Swiss-Prot record:
Any matching Pfam family: Ribosomal_L22
Family annotation (PANTHER family): 60S RIBOSOMAL PROTEIN L17 (PTHR11593:SF10)
One CC-aspect GO term: cytosolic large ribosomal subunit
HAMAP family per the UniProt record, alphabetical: Ribosomal_uL22_A
UniProt protein name: Large ribosomal subunit protein uL22
Alphabetic keyword roster: Ribonucleoprotein, Ribosomal protein, RNA-binding, rRNA-binding
């Protein structure tokens, strides 16, 4: 039996780092990439607070790559953005899992920094709707893999 999955992060140090992964999440890969870009480099507690604000529709996520026909959001100098609630909830679960993994290893949860977070496309769940005259319309659902690596910052 082979490896189930790998992480794209190299040089993982189990003494100082913890990681978590969410596989086959039924969220948009494009919005997941945008949220991950915002969270990369944040302290873990700040990232969880940020996601809570996104879920409460108080703070938008700027769209830098997938922003065609997106309206600007309120705020000084804020360009195209959205409130991806479903994506934020899914990524928050993975971040909490990474935090719990770090606590299990004995790392201080207040000193954890997100050094790697990535979203990758998962398999497509294919389906179809029957239509009139014997036809069918495809309904495909995208899935996404999220991986997170946190490191304890020593000051």
């Amino acid at each position: 039996m082979g490896k189930r999955f790998g992480y794209s992060f190299q040089n993982f140090d189990p003494e100082r780092m913890a990681r978590a992964s969410g596989r086959d999440l039924r969220i948009s890969p494009k919005l997941a990439v945008e949220v991950c870009r915002e969270l990369r480099g944040m302290m873990l507690n700040d990232a969880l607070r940020y996601l809570d604000e996104v879920i409460a529709l108080k703070r938008p996520v700027p769209l830098r790559r997938y922003n065609d026909s997106q309206g600007h959001k309120p705020g000084k100098g804020f360009g195209p953005g959205r409130y991806p609630v479903k994506v934020a909830k899914a990524i928050k679960k993975v971040l909490l899992n990474a935090k719990n993994n770090a606590e299990q290893k004995g790392l201080d949860p207040d000193k954890l920094k997100i050094i790697h977070i990535a979203a990758h496309r998962g398999p497509v769940l294919r389906g179809w709707y029957p239509r009139a005259f014997g036809r069918a319309t495809p309904f495909n659902e995208q899935t996404t893999h999220i991986e997170v690596v946190v490191e304890e910052i020593r000051r």
